Amino acid sequence: MSLDNFSKGALAISGETTLLYQDIARSVQKEKGIKIVNFGIGQPDFPTFQKIRDEAKKALDGGFTAYTSAYGIDELRAKIASFLSSKYNTNISSKEVIITPGAKVSLYLAFLLYVNPGDEVIIFDPSYYSYPEVVKMLGGKPVYVKMKWREDTGFSLNLNDLENKITDKTKMVVLNNPHNPTGMVFDPKEIDQLIEIAKSKNLIVLSDEIYDYFVYEGKMRSVLEDPDWKNFSIYVNGFSKTFSMTGWRLGYVVAKENVIKKMSEIAANVYTCPTSFAQKAAVSAFDTFDDVKKMIDTFKKRRDVMYSELKKIKGIQVNKSQGAFYMFPYLGEILRKSGMSTKDFSVNLIKEKGVVTIPGEVFPLDAGKEFVRLSFAVDENVIKEGVQRMSEFINQLMRS
């Protein structure tokens, strides 16, 4: 038996590809001493709000450091159930909530619960790159539905193609709204239509709503607003983005009670429980929405700055982000003239100008192959400097 003889599931997946570009940036900074402008960041740059930190200290000092239930602490489950019930005018019991060590674990539990080898999971392209990786690890098959893009309106869900891709092996559709990497907030009518398709075909909708408070334009539709949500959906969210708690690793799932019970059985055998004192602190997060609003207002200003700066660059087509904290400009003309792929573009931009962007072709197939993702989770002055460097780099490409 060789330690190099990995399982089929392990061999089916690759690492987090965005980290590659962070590694290149670190090397460039070390070798050339260039100040790095990091538009590759997928987390808010705000510290966790003071009240949450204070409650964590209080929990630690009070000795709240033992195991909890695999479901998570009752106080936090009840808080989430009450909050979402009020927000979406629905009825959620605390028994329909499980706390997890991050929204990624929530997604993993959902996939693990339903995906058998050979099952198909529909994933929109572009989308967050981890979705298909976990499906492949479990022996499932990601089936990609290419989103529609228009220069004037940006990306939208291709529901006709979605229907055409459904087979008797299709188990689930993955929805992310607001959307990473495109920054779209999908039209509520599109979401309603997707839900109706899923219901008619007896499919599960796995809805990743981690960016639900990062909405600058339009109205976000949650699956929990559908009166029949318990019969078709698994809702995933977490504390990382809204409350700037990425390192705390806390997420949660809302689903009908027997689904949550089965998830808790998996949890008990995989990670036992989420961190006790982090859960205790997270209860207070729901009292920090004044801080959340200030953060979102700041992000909206940053979005406006990045959009206006990118619009100045000849050859770029950019739609103003409606949600999340990403801009996803189209570089087709620049790439054709330079002979580069977006991966080439991103690597060379780091090496020559010290600016990190993430190539669209990693999200996760090819619908984003002429786009790059830029995060505006950085200071406005940093945005201006980074886009200026990017402009200089593009001008050099267009002249050569």
From Swiss-Prot:
Chief location bin: cytoplasm
CDD domains, per the entry: AAT_like (cd00609)
EC number(s) from the headed UniProt entry: 2.6.1.1
GO CC, one annotated term: cytoplasm
An example Gene Ontology molecular-function term: pyridoxal phosphate binding
Cofactors that this protein relies on: pyridoxal 5'-phosphate
Protein name: Aspartate aminotransferase
